[in-house]
Amino acid sequence: MAKSKSSQGASGARRKPAPSLYQHISSFKPQFSTRVDDVLHFSKTLTWRSEIIPDKSKGTLTTSLLYSQGSDIYEIDTTLPLKTFYDDDDDDDNDDDDEEGNGKTKSAATPNPEYGDAFQDVEGKPLRPKWIYQGETVAKMQYLESSDDSTAIAMSKNGSLAWFRDEIKVPVHIVQEMMGPATRYSSIHSLTRPGSLAVSDFDVSTNMDTVVKSQSNGYEEDSILKIIDNSDRPGDILRTVHVPGTNVAHSVRFFNNHLFASCSDDNILRFWDTRTADKPLWTLSEPKNGRLTSFDSSQVTENLFVTGFSTGVIKLWDARAVQLATTDLTHRQNGEEPIQNEIAKLFHSGGDSVVDILFSQTSATEFVTVGGTGNVYHWDMEYSFSRNDDDNEDEVRVAAPEELQGQCLKFFHTGGTRRSSNQFGKRNTVALHPVINDFVGTVDSDSLVTAYKPFLASDFIGRGYDD
């Protein structure tokens, strides 16, 4: 039986009173068909598949996680209480009648399984790998929802890519990055930048036609971006772009089918177009607030993105305003840098470094940040956007940082053994479900897998519990 942790976490100061509750939370430690001598030794990542299967007769909703450990990738079914993840009020017209002919809602008709049972179907059963990336350590995975050719892409620690398909255990396409003199051990494990040169990343365009991946070339001179076909000839390298003056481009994200940005260790975001010359369209320089460690772009709107720093600072931006500032010469007659201002500035408590950022795929205003401690912060920027609505233009008052923080931090999750602070060890260990709003999966270094959905202050008030 999975362990229930309904007492963990605390919601942010969005409204009061704000309960410290979960709508659902389940955890379990997988068992494996092959012997694993030291589970802590293996790198772990996870991502969700997008399929959801409701079963009204059982009162359940089934979806699945893709979980990697070393070179092995597993699929883990997650069975959830339907009532928790489905809004009965949206479909009242389809309510059934009872035997007396009286109308009754699905809430009354649908069983409500106990919380904490999401992994009961796999609890105690040895897992067998769905896919194997032989000889590699998986560092990131992405599910390909609408691809006819492949089911998922996995990236290894050395920057290689592999495409996997259901029912086939080995990769169907590979982009291999060979380990040679340019990627010798002493270069990958740089003494001047420990561990940083091992960082690589990839992202898939909105239409799934193109992959962009970033990596170090191993010489500690410049990082590399590779634009790769994911349509007609998956795995074919279309173009290679060198990013001068950067050792590592540690994050890449698409904004749409062609526009993407890379985030480098020189604290500069560069915005590119896959169809144009090998120079960025424009840049955003962030020399303050510590090292620029992560960023993500919204998948609901093409314009919003968030940056995170080693000091725990988080900034929300509008790409249109950033681009416009590069052409505005009003205050730059003497060659000054562009004045590029963020929409909002937030922070992790205690200076907890920002190691990962995940924009919601179901909401234009929500995103999640992951701290170096492993803590997960849930943010909703609706309050900030409503203050800057055009209808309120004449009465806009800039919110104080504490006010903005209290209104936008809607939930805070502390999970399992996520206590060691390793800047690059926590990337890709938290995943937002692409269909179920606010549903999160996490994996800890000891392989503890947790799935949870917060019970938010707005939900609490909406159900009549506020005073």
Curated annotation (Swiss-Prot):
Protein name as annotated: Transcriptional modulator WTM2
Acidic residues composition bias: residue spans: 87-100
InterPro entries membership: WD40/YVTN_repeat-like_dom_sf, WD40_repeat_dom_sf, WD40_rpt, WD_repeat_RBAP46/RBAP48/MSI1
Gene Ontology molecular function terms on file: DNA-binding transcription factor activity, RNA polymerase II-specific; histone binding; transcription corepressor activity
Note: Present with 3750 molecules/cell in log phase SD medium.
Gene transcribed to yield this protein: WTM2
PROSITE patterns (alphabetical): WD_REPEATS_REGION (PS50294)
Pfam families from the UniProt entry: WD40
Biased composition range(s): Low complexity: 1-12
